[in-house]
């Protein structure tokens, strides 16, 4: 339950680590918490968090791969950050899609010793697809590279890769360092200094996002659990608008729309009177049983959004090189459509005269979902098949 009240004093930014497995994302996250606990000790958000704590997803233990998305908080002198440590392994790209969707900016971690790897590319592509607007690069493990020219080469490769996916590769800040050195207490240029440089880059390069505070309230449900004697809690990130205690909301999508009243709001285990766009919160819902709400639904201001099953979309189909399909697909192809926090099966109808769609194509299509999803025009989605992303799209027109 809540421990104290969440105070909003600094602008709030959502960031996260992305990059290839074992390039040091979780080590970097731990190093940031350590360095800030030392340098900005007066901010209650700053607590040193151990690597093991960040890496504590249950499946984790056997495989040494971060699976669940772990949320940390920390603050610089100017800002409060909520940080997600995104899973690095291809098997868990699905989790990354939900994690990366929460970012105002991402920290791309690349091992200077290895350079960009397949998942580096995949995560940059995903960041582009799910609309991560800014990327800052941390070239990690620089202590393992003796040749400064090699470092420059890796930096160039990363910049080119970013440009390839329409990020401004020439302008992106690149910080060189060693997260492990920083975590071990090294105060030198590659250690603590590199973490401080990275934080400065986050503060300066990632603009304070224009929050959609004035739009109607919307939260995509990520998880649901019940609290003995209090009721059902839905967690997720407020996409837009504000939510006040005791306000009425609708549960939209998958099942018939229902109304309920919000009887509690929490963020980082602290109770709040009001949540706003960008906050990751838990919401206590009156009269809703644990099995009456599920991941993939949304909580929304009454009447503000409706569920739909048929829509038109503009879609980019990943090429084989990007990890997409190797073969074309035709009308009546039935992949999964990943909206916000869940997969829904849908059938594709290509336009008149379009016989098939090749990997690497852009195309317009109509989609019929098997269950309704809360949507508006402009909503992004991923197309997935057998656990991997094969396309990305945006809803251009709602049909029914």
Swiss-Prot record:
Q: Could you tell me where this protein is found in the cell? A: Cytoplasm
Outline the extent of the tr-type G domain.
10-210
Domain of life, per lineage: Bacteria
Gene giving rise to this polypeptide: tuf1
Query: Does this UniProt record's set of keywords contain Transcription?
Result: no
Q: What is this protein called?
A: Elongation factor Tu
Reactions catalysed, semicolon-separated, are: GTP + H2O = GDP + phosphate + H(+)
Query: What is the protein's major site of localization?
Result: cytoplasm
Q: Which PROSITE patterns match?
A: G_TR_1 (PS00301), G_TR_2 (PS51722)
Alphabetized HAMAP family for the sequence: EF_Tu_B
Positions of the region G1?
Answer: 19-26
Q: Name one GO cellular component term.
A: cytosol
